[in-house]
Swiss-Prot record:
This is ATPase ASNA1 homolog. Keywords: ATP-binding, Cytoplasm, Endoplasmic reticulum, Hydrolase, Nucleotide-binding, Transport. It comes from Babesia bovis. Homodimer. Pfam families: ArsA_ATPase. The active site is at D64. ATP binds at K35, G36, G37, V38, G39, K40, T41, T42, E235, N262. CDD domains: ArsA (cd02035). ATPase required for the post-translational delivery of tail-anchored (TA) proteins to the endoplasmic reticulum. Recognizes and selectively binds the transmembrane domain of TA proteins in the cytosol. This complex then targets to the endoplasmic reticulum by membrane-bound receptors, where the tail-anchored protein is released for insertion. This process is regulated by ATP binding and hydrolysis. ATP binding drives the homodimer towards the closed dimer state, facilitating recognition of newly synthesized TA membrane proteins. ATP hydrolysis is required for insertion. GO terms for biological process: tail-anchored membrane protein insertion into ER membrane. It is an enzyme of class 3 (hydrolase). One of its GO terms (molecular function) is ATP hydrolysis activity. It is found in: Cytoplasm; Endoplasmic reticulum. The keyword Endoplasmic reticulum applies.
Length: 358
């Protein structure tokens, strides 16, 4: 009698596509980041078009000061969500965090979240940036999009951006610990501002603000709600920054399970085609065509040398991440990816099985 053993598939398996990402209906925040020039905007825009196929409403938001969303879609975007041409449920906006910081005072007069920020807190160094992040997340969430994709700034700015809730949470925790010992002093400082308040009222506001920030922070650390996609190219600096980014995301407890390796080159195999073509020419033709054939050989050699360099870093990426990450390889496009049709086509590539070519 043959014994039948039940085969149990593991709950989570790595893939070489973004199928699971697109099908994960619980996701609310998708951050796309990496070194400058690796194609983050193309990737984030393409993912947004794919999510628009499965989600009720999608917001694509650029926080990179050097905005490129308008170029990617061939449509002007501003700091307010605007419907992307050709879609009924995909919106895009370009926003600098500095714009939020500059407008904090005005927003505090009208926004329920910022009304709870005591004047004394605005004196703390770095508080404006931290509040701008929480204000951004609260504002986006209030618009009730099913999912928001962030096209982020280069790595260094992104890491600072993502650490802001943690920074603000620690500041408020420190203030709350001073409630008994320095409450009177804080109240004295508070009395010097526009809005005077009692010690209890001051700390009640700090606690309420802390609860709001804690909620945002917990959402950021919940892999069912938030994930980060690293985009890189197979070059030293990009791979180095990707490792740095992954390490920092791990320290911040932010889920990162996708790495998209962009601009991967293919080997050009000419074999004996050049020699056969050369041998088929007369001496006169060879004399005329010599410069052309030399250029072909030079470009062929240069291209394949670049491919060999890329293969080294592709191998490093595979060794470092293949067991724990969904790694998607995207070959170098012949043309710029611009406009709805090109972005949708690019998204289809990301949805297909695309392992590293090594």
């Amino acid at each position: 009698m043959v014994e039948i053993t039940e085969v149990i598939e593991p709950e989570w398996q790595t893939r070489n596509d973004i199928q699971n990402l697109v099908n994960q209906k619980t996701l609310q925040w998708v951050f796309v980041g990496g070194k400058g020039g690796v194609g983050k905007t193309t990737i984030s825009s393409s993912i947004a078009t794919a999510l628009a196929e499965t989600r009720e409403s999608v917001l694509l938001l650029s926080t990179d000061p050097a905005h490129s969303l308008s170029d990617a879609f061939g449509q002007k975007f501003t700091h307010e969500p605007r419907l992307v041409n050709g879609f009924t449920n995909l919106y895009a906006m370009e926003l600098n965090t500095s714009q939020i910081i500059d407008g904090l005072d005005g927003l505090r007069e009208t926004h329920s979240f910022l009304k709870n920020v005591p004047d004394i807190l605005m004196m703390l160094p770095g508080i404006d940036e931290a509040l701008s992040f929480v204000e951004l997340m609260q504002s986006v969430q209030s618009r009730r999009f099913s999912v928001t994709i962030f096209d982020t700034a280069p790595t260094g700015h992104t890491l600072k951006f993502l650490k802001l809730p943690d920074v603000l949470e620690k500041i408020l925790d420190s203030l709350l610990k001073l409630e008994n010992t320095m409450g009177g002093l804080l109240q004295l400082f508070s009395s010097m501002t526009k809005a005077q308040m009692s010690q209890n009222e001051l700390f009640d506001k700090i606690k309420l603000l802390g609860d709001m920030i804690n909620t945002t922070h917990e959402q950021m650390k919940n892999p069912d709600l938030t994930t980060f996609i690293c985009v890189c190219i197979p070059e030293f600096l990009s791979v180095y920054e990707t490792e740095r980014l992954i390490q920092d995301l791990a320290k911040s407890e932010i889920d990162c399970s996708y790495i998209i390796v962009n601009q991967v080159l293919k080997h050009i195999q000419l074999g004996g085609l050049i020699e056969d073509a050369w041998d088929g020419l007369t001496e006169e033709q060879q004399r005329i065509m010599t410069p052309f054939f030399e250029k072909v050989r030079e470009h062929h050699s240069t291209h394949n040398s670049r491919v060999d360099v890329q293969r080294k870093y592709l191998s490093d990426i595979k060794d470092l991440y293949q067991e724990d990450f969904n790694i998607v390889a995207v070959h170098q496009n012949k043309q710029e990816v611009r406009g709805k049709d090109a972005l949708v086509a690019f998204a289809k590539k990301l949805m297909q099985h695309s392992p590293l070519p090594i």
